[in-house]
Regions:
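Conserved AMP-binding/adenylation subdomain of ANL enzymes
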Residues: 185-207, 214-313
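N-lobe entry segment of adenylate-forming
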Residues: 1-68, 73, 157, 550-587, ...
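Conserved AMP-binding A3 loop
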Residues: 50-52, 157-186
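Conserved AMP-binding/adenylate-forming
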Residues: 44-49, 62-107, 210-211, 307-432, 437-440, 455, 617
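Thiotemplate assembly-line natural product biosynthesis machinery
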Residues: 560-608, 627-635, 647, 652, ...
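AMP-binding/adenylate-forming catalytic core of the ANL superfamily
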Residues: 388, 392, 412-414, 418-506, ...
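Conserved C-terminal "lid"/linker of ANL adenylate-forming enzymes
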Residues: 499-576, 629, 644
Length: 662
């Protein structure tokens, strides 16, 4: 069996003796020629590519670029590809050809992409996307080049660039050299010193899920360089849907996942949603098991993880399987309940921190579960120092910092110490992020309030997304729901949220609640940008409806940038948290909705008696019944377990059931 500990020691020794350039990184990384560099599904079978095979393709692509564009050597080349073998070939091939890769944010609007490319004086773009007609496009899927066993004898470039904002607002370009990446690789050594779980594999392998795009600093530094520098295996996905992610993790026996909280929040919601449909006995059994698991993991952490996986075998089998050994959440706030449940069932999940400008700088690595679920982002890695500015924001000093920031206003190279704008506090040497300074809201008494403090404590069950932010000078909550999501469920959820706000820190400062059926963030966003949300509201792309006016009408009028005259007359103490739907309205609305679903399933316009049996009185078939179940499940966002609930035959049966679970 491979000695991972010795391999790490040898690789680190080799890179420390070098000049710490990208070529040096490549030489050490690709010295493990027969190790599997990456794998993916091709024609429903797992295809594996070794570091030797990948290196030959990289050498060939580098020669192609050098021969095709000799006049561009030393310049930036744009790179816009999804995570794939072709991305790796292109990334390293560009560097080997003497050019500098600029990792284009694929989610940016076309105009912004072009503006940033122009800023870097880019002429060539490696891509298979069709929005670069103004540039010389090289499609690695179509261009012809031969695999070469030896690389070019030319000077490598030692610089890469990527954008600093996922939203595109105030986008800047951060430039890293090989030394900064070596600093990130050294983080792996810091992690191993504090927690050896990072080097645990499954069936002798360590496999990392390539989930987050490599144009994102977290995707590039954590998912790729952190472990692949030691000859580990990347696993690529066909797409990012939940079913595909779950299937790939299980099929490929993925061991390590570094991802934004959205992945872990989806996992948490899926588990809790399924659990809510189970019997009371099953739920009590689960909760008892969770208490036992957490207690053991606080005394014997690694043994406790093994026990948890046995206690929750059914949950493990239904989600990511039994191969997961180490996961890190980063890029945004993760809910403590999600941390507790995921760690509790036996998936070690740690909370990390970093920015585009600083790369990944800390992870909460203490093994006891009480620390893993605390919300801490840990202590900084070796060689990195945290300090607090006069404005109580985090400052980062260390070797992972980018070496240059390019903006439309000029360049900044004085980056030994970078101010992150994140409000933090330290507790016994471990750090907690409490919000962004530029998101602070000034309360009526002049106190600075971080919307994140409210948002991080608030429990919202059914909304796709939500955000606490300043709308028209008032601290407000925006809730996003699907177009067809029932108004009744929204009303019940808002009622629960209002109650919850009473016990949340600064919750009573929230003056208005808004409902929208429009997406308040891009599908691929790591987190919701408040500035971008307000921009979309101002442009009419997100239509907000104040909950006071919410009456089940799906048509929502766009809000203007400025408050209406009626809103202007509203005093600062008036609140939207006052209107409650009556119980009779709830009952009438839900019964009517279920009756309409009965009609659709039976393909009839006849009135449905609320006490009529679906089969005996209404003549429904088994196929009709499953149509009804699917309609109700999708519309009310519930998972009806027919093995547990086998007595749902009438409108009133379904109404009673929905009132119990919603």
């Amino acid at each position: 069996m491979e000695n991972i500990k010795k391999l790490v020691k040898d690789n680190i020794a080799a890179i420390q003796k070098s000049d710490k350039t990208f070529k040096d990184i490549y030489d050490v990384m690709f010295s493990h020629k027969d190790h599997v560099a990456c794998e993916f599904l091709e024609n429903h079978r797992i295809k594996k590519i070794t570091y030797r095979e990948l290196s030959e393709q990289i050498n060939g692509f580098a020669a192609f670029l050098r021969e095709s564009f000799p006049q561009n050597v030393g310049e930036y080349i744009g790179l816009d590809l999804k995570n794939s073998v072709e991305f790796l070939i292109s990334f390293w091939g560009i560097l080997q050809s003497g050019n500098k890769p600029y990792l284009i944010n694929s989610f940016y609007p076309e105009a912004l992409k072009h503006k940033l490319l122009t800023k870097l004086e880019v002429e060539i773009v490696v891509t298979n996307f069709g929005c670069y007609s103004d540039f010389h496009v090289v499609d690695p899927y179509e261009c012809s080049y031969s695999a070469l066993s030896e690389g070019l004898s030319t000077d490598w470039a030692n610089e890469i660039a990527l954008s600093s904002s996922l939203t595109g607002l105030d986008a800047k370009i951060c430039v890293f050299n090989g030394e900064a990446v070596v600093g990130q690789v050294n983080a792996a050594v810091s992690i191993l010193k504090r927690n050896h779980w990072l080097r645990l594999g499954y069936n002798g392998n360590i496999k990392i899920l390539a989930l987050l795009p490599f144009f994102h600093i977290y995707g590039l530094m954590a998912s790729y360089f952190l472990l692949c520098f030691f000859g580990r295996t990347l696993v690529f996905l066909q797409d990012m849907s939940s079913d595909v992610v779950r299937g790939v993790v299980n099929r490929h026996e993925v061991t390590h996942i570094f991802a934004p909280p959205i992945l872990f929040h989806k996992l948490y919601k899926g588990i809790t949603k399924t659990l809510s449909q189970e019997s009371e006995k099953t739920r009590k059994k689960f909760n008892t098991g969770m208490k036992i698991a957490c207690a053991v993991q606080n005394i014997y952490p690694l043994l406790g993880v093994s026990i948890s996986k046995k206690l929750f075998k059914e949950v493990i089998d239904a989600t990511f399987g039994k191969s997961i050994r180490f996961m890190i959440s980063g890029g945004a706030h993760i809910d403590k309940d999600a941390l507790k449940l995921i760690n509790g069932i036996g998936y070690p999940l740690f909370n990390g921190y970093g920015t585009t400008e600083t790369a990944i700088t800390s992870v909460e690595l203490r093994k006891k579960i009480k620390h893993r679920v605390s919300g801490s982002v840990g202590a900084p890695f070796d060689g990195i120092t945290y300090s607090v500015s006069d404005e109580n924001t985090l400052q980062v000093t260390g070797s992972t910092n980018c070496k240059k920031i390019i903006s439309f206003n000029g360049e900044d190279t004085d980056l030994a110490c970078i101010c992150t704008n994140d409000i933090v506090r330290s507790q016994n040497g471990h750090w907690f992020v409490e919000g962004r300074r530029n998101d602070l809201f000034i309360g009526e008494n002049g106190e600075n309030i971080s919307p994140d403090v409210i948002q991080n404590e608030l429990k919202v069950k059914n909304a796709n997304n939500f955000s606490v932010l300043d709308v028209d000078g008032k601290l407000s909550l925006v809730l996003e729901y699907n177009e067809a999501f029932p108004d009744l469920v929204i009303q019940k959820e808002v009622a629960a949220i209002k109650q919850s706000l009473r016990s949340v820190h600064y919750g009573l400062e929230v003056r208005d609640i808004y409902i929208t059926r429009d997406k308040i963030a891009n599908d691929n966003a790591v987190k919701i940008s408040r500035a971008n949300l307000l921009k979309m509201v101002g442009e009419g792309k997100v239509r907000l409806q104040k909950y006071d006016d919410f009456s089940g009408n799906k048509k929502e009028e766009p809000r203007a940038n400025q408050p209406t005259s009626e809103q202007s007359r509203t005093t600062s103490t008036q609140t939207a948290l006052t209107i409650e739907p009556s119980a009779s309205d709830d009952t009438e609305a839900s019964v009517l909705m279920v009756k309409q679903m009965f009609q659709r399933a039976l393909d009839t316009t006849d009135d449905i008696d609320v006490s009529a049996n679906f089969f005996f009185d209404l003549g429904g078939t088994s196929l009709d019944y499953f149509t009804l179940i699917n309609d109700i499940s999708a519309s009310f966002n519930v998972n009806i377990n027919l093995e547990q609930k086998n007595n749902l035959y009438t409108v009133l049966d379904f109404h009673k059931y929905l009132m119990e679970v919603l």
